[in-house]
Amino acid sequence: MSRVCQVTGKKPMVGNNRSHAKNATRRRFLPNLQNHRFWLEEEKRFVQLRVSTKGIRLIDKKGIEVVVAELRARGEKV
């Protein structure tokens, strides 16, 4: 399973670790992804999404029905 948020599209980024001596070694910054179940009232079922914590906050703000409609319009299976 890829490390991509289904709502925001956040993906891993690359950057550098920096030691005290300012040596640079490559590293990945991973999004804070959570597997989360959301209750869809209109369909009377749970939907499991892999979302970042920012995606969870967006769902709290917009509502799960709106977000699922956007995902389906994008062609994602929910």
Swiss-Prot record:
Belongs to the bacterial ribosomal protein bL28 family. SUPFAM superfamilies: L28p-like. One of its GO terms (cellular component) is cytosolic large ribosomal subunit. It comes from the Bacteria. GO terms for molecular function: structural constituent of ribosome. Residues 1-21 are annotated as: Disordered. GO terms for biological process: translation. Keywords: Ribonucleoprotein, Ribosomal protein. Pfam families: Ribosomal_L28. This is Large ribosomal subunit protein bL28. InterPro entries: Ribosomal_bL28, Ribosomal_bL28/bL31-like_sf, Ribosomal_bL28_bact-type, Ribosomal_bL28_sf.
